Regions:
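Acidic, surface-exposed loops and disordered segments
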Residues: 1-170
Length: 170
């Protein structure tokens, strides 16, 4: 898949088939995420991956209660922010966002679906990730991605809005 096509057609999937996600696919996703740009080349991230059914079911309760996507997902990836690894202080959220976008685009390219679940600054979700995935206190759970083969088809739609573009000055 070409990069522009991947960007324009990526969608957030919340329903997944009962189909495996392989270790090789997960490794490729992590490699893509870790190749994201970061301020000062700090790469201030750690990743927690689970394919354990009990943990995925627990995430459905502890992180996103009432949402069935974790019960259908075959895997989940949590990106954690490590402030001690920031190349330049204060840019860790941007760095982790770049890694998250790479992960989502790589998943799309491989025919997998995911959705970005915001964790940072949402205390109940942060606590849920710490509880289920054993995240240490010095790490900051940033974003969580249920992962699987999509069980729905979502049409690509243009999101370009020329009224939000300002040339030379506002």
């Amino acid at each position: 898949m070409e990069t522009i096509q991947a960007i324009m057609t990526r969608r957030s999937f919340r329903a997944f088939k009962d189909a495996p996600v392989t270790e090789e696919q997960i490794k490729t996703l992590l490699e893509a995420a870790m190749n994201a740009p970061s301020a000062g080349d700090g790469r201030p991230w750690h990743f927690v991956v689970t394919t354990d059914r009990a943990q995925l079911d627990a995430l459905a309760v502890e992180v996103d209660e009432g949402n069935e996507m974790f019960k259908q997902a075959q895997a989940a990836v949590l990106i954690c922010l490590d402030r001690l690894l920031e190349g330049f202080g204060g840019f860790g959220e941007q760095d982790c966002s770049c890694a998250a976008q790479n992960l989502q685009l790589a998943a799309h390219d491989m025919g997998l679906g995911t959705v970005w679940i915001a964790i940072i600054n949402v205390p109940p979700r942060t606590a849920g990730c710490r509880k289920v995935l054993g995240v240490p206190d010095e790490q900051i759970p940033f974003a969580l991605f249920p992962l699987g083969v999509p069980d729905e088809e979502l049409e690509a739609e243009t999101r370009f809005d020329e009224s939000r573009v300002h040339i030379d000055r506002w």
